[in-house]
Amino acid sequence: MIFDAQTHLFSRWYYAALWKQKHGSEPSDQDLHCMLKPVGLAAPPGDPAEHAALLVQQMRHHGVDRAVLFTSLPGEQATVAAACKASAGRLIGYTMVNPRAADALPLAHRDLTELGLRGIELFPAMHRFDPSDESLVYPFYELASRSCVPVFVHVGLLRVKLREKLGMACPYDMRYSDPLRLHRAAADHPKVNFILPHLGCGNLREAAMLGAACPNVHIDTSSSNQWMKLMPEPLTLERAMAVCLEAFGPNRILFGTDSSVLPRGYRYDIKESLELAMEAVELGAEDRGKIMGGNLARLLGINDE
């Protein structure tokens, strides 16, 4: 089974929310078209089921069986849940949580119990919080533990390029992007499975240290890994994979693409790059199968056999 650990819906709701943040009004279809066309994007179908059908069609074309579908802004959960419901089990949704919002905890509980979402996403730099803040964030880890769902924690470089292209503010605080800020929380919640993205996204060393210290921390391979261009020493995907195999082992690495926008669609090129990197580090067929889907299926309790 090929199971992508990270994709984004980037629904019409999402683009409308960006428009409202920028202009303070509800957009028309023409407004969205005018906003997206100059940056090379197309507005997706307004119907989540139709949008999901497009995603699944692209996944199947590239040999991908399932994918995790991220919520990309708090408030998009119902749309993501509707897309997942229409996908016949091929899309598995996560909910984005801003722990600083007053109603975040009851909404997260609703998302997991009523909407059927199966993971929690945290973006510490985006929402400006320490992921090991006991009073603010630990209740969400306890919810994840009770619900038997993983917790995704974004680390490393955070850029939402669409916001940048649209001239929108990106008031992030990357002091909270260090993977080691999660160490105390991961150690305090050994039954919670944590997932870091993008091979550490510029913090490979710190992500590897955390993975070596905490057996409940996993890492995904998603995105085109443009952050490697920022490293003071040359770094390749093959070398990054070798480091992660040493720190996490083949049981805690998850294939992902970070696929999102239309018309580009599914990032099959990222999938192919990972397959070449695994071949380069001489990974056996069993371990490749774990990384490409088996590990994530285990975390989410999915068994297609």
Q: Model-found features: residue ranges?
A:
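Mid-to-C-terminal alpha-helical segments outside catalytic/metal-binding sites
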Residues: 1-61, 66, 243, 248-254, ...
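Active-site neighborhood of phospho(di)ester-bond hydrolases with catalytic His/Asp-centered motifs
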Residues: 2-5, 69-70, 94-95, 194-197, ...
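Conserved, mostly hydrophobic/aromatic
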Residues: 6, 59, 80, 120, ...
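Active-site environment of divalent metal-dependent phosphoester hydrolases
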Residues: 10-12, 74-76, 100-103, 157-161, ...
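Short, surface-exposed connector motifs at secondary-structure boundaries
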Residues: 61-66, 88-91, 187-194
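Active-site gating/metal-coordination segments in enzymes
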Residues: 65-66, 72-174, 223
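Short, electropositive alpha-helical surface patch
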Residues: 81-86, 206-218, 270-279
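Catalytic pocket-lining loop regions of alpha/beta-barrel enzymes
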Residues: 118-119, 133-254
